[in-house]
Amino acid sequence: MEPAVSEPMRDQVARTHLTEDTPKVNADIEKVNQNQAKRCTVIGGSGFLGQHMVEQLLARGYAVNVFDIQQGFDNPQVRFFLGDLCSRQDLYPALKGVNTVFHCASPPPSSNNKELFYRVNYIGTKNVIETCKEAGVQKLILTSSASVIFEGVDIKNGTEDLPYAMKPIDYYTETKILQERAVLGANDPEKNFLTTAIRPHGIFGPRDPQLVPILIEAARNGKMKFVIGNGKNLVDFTFVENVVHGHILAAEQLSRDSTLGGKAFHITNDEPIPFWTFLSRILTGLNYEAPKYHIPYWVAYYLALLLSLLVMVISPVIQLQPTFTPMRVALAGTFHYYSCERAKKAMGYQPLVTMDDAMERTVQSFRHLRRVK
């Protein structure tokens, strides 16, 4: 890491001591320290969450590097580094000289590519940890997922003390568990390397490439007719700006003296909503019909399981991507919402955007997907 006080600054300090102008010296040193603390890198900054994070960091006065495998935006305020996070040679220049790294790179959960998840989420993250240490980075903030404790059964107001899932619902979750364990296990205050993990759930908002587009595509294809279960299961959906806010709070509160190091924190909108109510509001906001027929949860789950087995059998010949997998049925038909109390107490977290405002802004941002009646 670059020295906190450069050689010219040391000369200035020496001269100032001779003139007994110590207040100016202290002010200059403090300014240097503040500037260093606000130098960061966003790994995965071209993605959905990453772009929103970069925008909020810039608005708060941070100097931002972006590291990504693809160029997702062009912003002259940002230093962009193109590369593979599994390559230390690619990654090191983007981390050298920064105080904080936000690691939010991951393949989308829907990709279902086991090898890709393992390579990026686990192998890549281990490389991030080692390269951070080599580059002198002091803080590593990981974007994890609340799904690391979800096994397809109800979770109501779940806390971070719940154990990791013994039977993760998909490859994404399986590798996020490995990833989070690696990052939290690397926390080392004695060597001035501090880590924490943010666990959002159901991220949505403007420019979302997954939830809303996939939902609308399913509606257009006539696949959003049925509610799985009774439709009363509460779920956490989290507006992207609230997720970013949680990351930045964690970075700013993380220190040797804080209780954040080596711990995970749930970050949600703190307003659990029935899963099907959320989807219905998005659909009707874009002029699509809400699902109105009900199918028992157990029927949907076993049908999805049977279909998945069939897809596995014929996969050497035909490649199919079923809409409702057992994982998606579990996500759609069970309770899974999480407590933010730890984040509230440790870092003063409160959602910045309410669910009503978040949904309105999201719907307005996808007007191009609106159905014309």
Swiss-Prot record:
Brain, heart, liver, lung, kidney, skin and placenta. The active site is at 172 (proton acceptor). InterPro entries: 3Beta_OHSteriod_DH/Estase, Lipid_A_modif_metabolic_enz, NAD(P)-bd_dom_sf. GO terms for biological process: cholesterol biosynthetic process; cholesterol metabolic process; hair follicle development; labyrinthine layer blood vessel development; smoothened signaling pathway. Its EC number is 1.1.1.170. The chain crosses the membrane at residues 298-318. It holds the Pfam family 3Beta_HSD. The modification Phosphothreonine is found at residue 22. One of its GO terms (cellular component) is endoplasmic reticulum. It is found in: Endoplasmic reticulum membrane; Lipid droplet. It catalyses: a 3beta-hydroxysteroid-4alpha-carboxylate + NADP(+) = a 3-oxosteroid + CO2 + NADPH; a 3beta-hydroxysteroid-4alpha-carboxylate + NAD(+) = a 3-oxosteroid + CO2 + NADH; 4alpha-carboxyzymosterol + NADP(+) = zymosterone + CO2 + NADPH; 4alpha-carboxy-4beta-methyl-5alpha-cholest-8-en-3beta-ol + NADP(+) = 4alpha-methyl-5alpha-cholest-8-en-3-one + CO2 + NADPH. A motif (Prevents secretion from ER) lies at residues 370-373. NAD(+) binds at residue 176. Its main location: endoplasmic reticulum. Pathway: Steroid biosynthesis; zymosterol biosynthesis; zymosterol from lanosterol: step 4/6. The modification N-acetylmethionine is found at residue 1. Gene3D superfamilies: NAD(P)-binding Rossmann-like Domain. Catalyzes the NAD(P)(+)-dependent oxidative decarboxylation of the C4 methyl groups of 4-alpha-carboxysterols in post-squalene cholesterol biosynthesis. Also plays a role in the regulation of the endocytic trafficking of EGFR. It is linked to Congenital hemidysplasia with ichthyosiform erythroderma and limb defects: An X-linked dominant disorder of lipid metabolism with disturbed cholesterol biosynthesis, which typically results in male lethality. Clinically, it is characterized by congenital, unilateral, ichthyosisform erythroderma with striking lateralization, sharp midline demarcation, and ipsilateral limb defects and hypoplasia of the body. Limbs defects range from hypoplasia of digits or ribs to complete amelia, often including scoliosis. Belongs to the 3-beta-HSD family. Homodimer. This is Sterol-4-alpha-carboxylate 3-dehydrogenase, decarboxylating.
